[in-house]
Amino acid sequence: IMPSLVGSEMCIRDSSMANVLYGLKNTHKITLENIIQHTLSVKMAIKKSLLVVDMPKNSYSNVKKAEKNAKLIIKKTGCDAVKLESNNKNFTIIDRLVKKKISVMGHIGFTPQFKKKFKVEGDTKEKANKLINEALLIEKAGAFAIVLECISPKTAKLITAKLKIPTIGIGSSSFCDGQILVTDDMLGISGFYPKFVKKYINLNRIIEKAVKKYTREVKLNKFPSTNNFLNGTKRK
């Protein structure tokens, strides 16, 4: 929410909240209800940022299901677009959604909903060509933008050069048109920090200090002080 309040152009309500908020090992257990509920809280706070919602795993396993659930997400949350992770099979799904006037963002490279091992993608010529072709097919299907996750710098640069739609990088170098990070990662709240993450502040440490100080003051009867009393009631 905070990035959208200070000038970020886009906010993605991603299924990675499974790891960040619930402490789960992967994103597979996030449900449609989870994503809708969390998106509602974000929608209430943001003003100008484009709001994109990540469709949970298994919510778009076929064209009919994808259309039904995408429409439900948009209706319930008022978001601007949905995001689909690519498995090299859902180009027809993207095409169908776009024809139904639903804005779609693609996602290639490391796709947490379909891949278990966290590694650099597109680091060989053969793998790079597959990713380039995949990106072009997603663009052809009608996606308005595409996330490149954990893709080698050289391949990310090639993809960005070949596409007409914007590429949004996460762990894919500066050779992308835009960048995203998990808010909790950049603020230093989460406990896992991949190499591509830059912590702009260590909120974990700040929060820890604040809670310790609060606990100490309560035990020493320093909080609440008279300044915190209601109606000017003096402490006896």
Region locations from a protein language model:
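C-terminal alpha-helical cap/extension of soluble enzyme domains
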Residues: K154, I165-K236
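N-terminal small/glycine-rich loop or linker at the start of catalytic domains
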Residues: S16-G23, I46-P56, K99-D123, T183-K195
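Structural preference for beta-strand elements that scaffold enzyme active sites
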Residues: E9, S41, L50-D54, D80-K83, ...
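Single conserved hydrophobic/aromatic residue that forms the stacking wall/gate
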Residues: I1-G7, I12
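Active-site/ligand-binding-proximal alpha/beta "capping" segment
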Residues: K68, L72-I74, T124-K164, K212-K213, ...
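Glycine-rich, proline-tolerant flexible connector loops at the mouths of alpha/beta enzymes
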Residues: I12-Q37, M55-Y60, L84-I94, A143-L158
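Active-site mouth loops of central-metabolism enzymes
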Residues: S8, G23-K29, V53-K65, F114-L131, ...
